[in-house]
Regions:
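Glycine-rich, basic loop-to-helix element that forms the pyrophosphate-binding segment
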Residues: 68-84
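Short, well-formed alpha-helical segments that are part of the catalytic scaffolds
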Residues: 19-34
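Cell-envelope/extracellular polymer assembly enzymes that use nucleotide-activated donors
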Residues: 9-11, 42, 175
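Conserved donor NDP-sugar-binding/catalytic core segment of glycosyltransferases
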Residues: 100-130
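A conserved acidic beta->alpha catalytic loop
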Residues: 47-55, 96
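A short, conserved alpha-helix in the catalytic core of glycosyltransferases
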Residues: 158-161, 169-188
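Short aromatic/hydrophobic "clamp" motif used to bind/position activated sugar donors
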Residues: 89
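Short beta-strand/loop segment that forms part of the nucleotide-sugar
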Residues: 39-49, 66
Length: 260
């Protein structure tokens, strides 16, 4: 198990569904960040319905491996939080990376007593005009709502107080940010955003399906989005399954068919 010292202070939770291509890269980014703090850091990879080498690679690279078979990313993250030994929880998706001073800044903000928790700005690992537009839209949304996501950070006691990640199939990150911010107000603390570090966001879906991907999806699925806004999320849930929960399954099937 990867621990920078005997006493674990920080637990980094990485949910993973068939992520053998990305899990080592993500773990290594956490290790680099862990080298810059003077406390114990554990890495927990939550293997979700994995049929590839994700668990094997995660364990070989020092992560604690736990499993969860649900089809809800929030539930997967909550499984990792339940297994965590650290006082501080940080979550990051497996295809993404954190910058090297992320954990140091997280600890500084939480130890200041001013912050209940928060998120981070997002920067993509490559850029084009449509990806830049996508980033601008995300940044504007974060700025006007104050609900920063990407990398979540808070004390484990805070996640326990709000019931963990909101167990919704979609927009669970926004719902969780709202819950943590609301709880923070009661405690006299702010929901914040890292200023000097950020999430390095994977562009794998853009690489495979084109850089205008999310604009095309929004246009083609406008009806599903409107129905979801009015309370009927059935069509939207199918879209979420296709683009997220089943994405790696399709990718793996395609890779295996090419190899055969």
């Amino acid at each position: 198990m990867f621990i920078m010292s005997n006493n674990i202070t920080v637990s980094v939770i990485i949910p993973a569904h068939n992520e053998e291509r990305y899990v080592v890269r993500c773990i290594n980014s956490v290790k680099r960040a862990a080298e810059r703090v003077k406390c114990g850091v554990e890495i927990i990879v939550v293997c979700n319905r994995c049929t590839d080498r994700t668990a094997e690679l995660a364990a070989a690279n020092g992560a604690v491996v736990v499993t969860d078979e649900s089809r809800c990313i929030a539930t997967v993250r909550n499984t990792g939080i339940s297994a965590a030994k650290g006082r501080v929880i940080v979550t990051i998706d497996c295809d993404n990376r954190m910058t090297e001073n992320t954990l140091r800044e997280v600890l500084g903000r939480l130890n200041s007593g001013k912050y209940i928790g928060g998120g981070a700005q997002v920067k993509f690992e490559r850029y084009s005009f449509p990806i830049r537009v996508n980033e601008i839209i995300c940044r504007l949304g974060f700025k006007f709502t104050g609900l920063y996501c990407g990398i979540f950070w808070a004390e484990k006691s805070t996640f326990k107080a709000v019931g963990g990640f909101a167990e919704k199939k979609a927009a669970e990150d926004i719902a969780t940010a709202i819950n943590i911010r609301r709880y923070g107000k009661k405690e006299g603390k702010k929901y914040g955003c890292l200023k000097n570090n950020h999430l390095i966001n994977s562009t794998r879906k853009f690489d495979e399906m084109g850089d205008w991907l999310y604009f095309r999806l929004a246009f083609r699925n406008a009806g599903a989005l409107i129905k979801a806004a009015l309370g009927d999320s059935s069509d939207y849930d199918k879209l979420i399954d296709e683009m997220f929960y089943d994405y790696n399954d399709r990718k793996r099937e395609n890779d295996l068919s090419v190899q055969s």
